Each structure stands twice: as structure tokens, then as C-alpha cells.
Amino acid sequence: MLGNKFVAQLALQHLRNRGLVNSPSRLTFVRNRFAWGSDAVGPNVPVGGKMGASENPELHTYDGDYRGTISKGDKPIPDYFYRTPTTGRTYIDRCVTYFISAVIWAWFSYHMYYHSGHLLGHWYMPYLSEFTDEELGIPKDSAEDPEYWGNHKKEYGTYR
């Protein structure tokens, strides 16, 4: 494997060959001269609705050309922007959002119904037939009737 010193010297030599570093004795991260015109050539980056630089047919493809689905109510996205505005959500964004939210809600509903212990913790959940009358607040059959069972003999609205 190459040593760090060798890699630094190789990088310095490469920068000297391109004319980005004038000083032969030290390597700095600040450019010593400005690049103008054809000297200021950078990497080919996506611009506008198309991908890659227009002079390079390998990078300038129409694979990434999407301007919205106008038939579904989207505003058309222009080719180029001076400053990129917020164009709103496109049809694809809405479809993907609805699909992901439907999957999440389906998963949550299924697990809350069938496997609620995974989400809320595990504990014993008795059947309703396992509860006693005392736990449910039902008096014994041999117990006296309560004194007050309702307002059968009073007019409606006078007993509140």
C-alpha cells in the first residue's frame, strides 16, 4: 500500500501540472490563482430536467427527464431555473406517499389486532368468562335488592 507521504507528493505533483499550485515548497488548500472561462471547467453535473452535460452524449441522457404528470394536476416543471422555486408535490410524490402510508397503517392495524403484545408489551389477557361476579360488580343472587332501582314513579326530568 502507498504511504501517506507518497500520496501527498503525488497529489502535489498533479496539482502543479494543472497549474493550481504555484508554490513548489508547500501544499495548501487555497488556490493561488482564479480560474476564468475555459479554465473553470468542473465536473459534469445534472442541470435542469436533463442529466449530464449537453456536449457529452453518454452523460446527457433523457433517463432523468421528468417534468411532472400534467394530466394528474401537476404544474409543469421548467427545464432550467435561475433559482429553484418550490414546485409542490408531483403525482409520483403523492402516489409514493400514499402507498407508504397505506403500508404503514396496514402493518400497524394488523399488529394491533393480532399481535398487540409486540407493540404494547406482553401480559396475560383473561377471557371474559374467567372474571368473577364480584370482580365485575355483580351482586350475589341471595343479596338484598338495592333500595333505589330507578325513577319509575316520577315524571321525566324531575329526578335530576
Swiss-Prot record:
Subunit structure: Complex I is composed of 45 different subunits.
Protein origin, superkingdom: Eukaryota
Compartmental location: Mitochondrion inner membrane
Protein name as it appears in the record: Probable NADH dehydrogenase [ubiquinone] 1 beta subcomplex subunit 2, mitochondrial
Gene: ndub-2
Protein topology in the membrane: Peripheral membrane protein
Source organism (scientific name): Caenorhabditis elegans
Gene Ontology biological process terms from the UniProt entry: mitochondrial respiratory chain complex I assembly
Family: Belongs to the complex I NDUFB2 subunit family.
Entries under PANTHER family matching the protein: NADH DEHYDROGENASE [UBIQUINONE] 1 BETA SUBCOMPLEX SUBUNIT 2, MITOCHONDRIAL, NADH-UBIQUINONE OXIDOREDUCTASE AGGG SUBUNIT
Keyword annotations from UniProtKB, A to Z: Electron transport, Membrane, Mitochondrion, Mitochondrion inner membrane, Respiratory chain, Transit peptide, Transport
Function field: Accessory subunit of the mitochondrial membrane respiratory chain NADH dehydrogenase (Complex I), that is believed not to be involved in catalysis. Complex I functions in the transfer of electrons from NADH to the respiratory chain. The immediate electron acceptor for the enzyme is believed to be ubiquinone.
A Pfam family the protein falls into: NADH_B2
Cellular component aspect of the GO annotation: mitochondrial inner membrane; mitochondrion; respiratory chain complex I
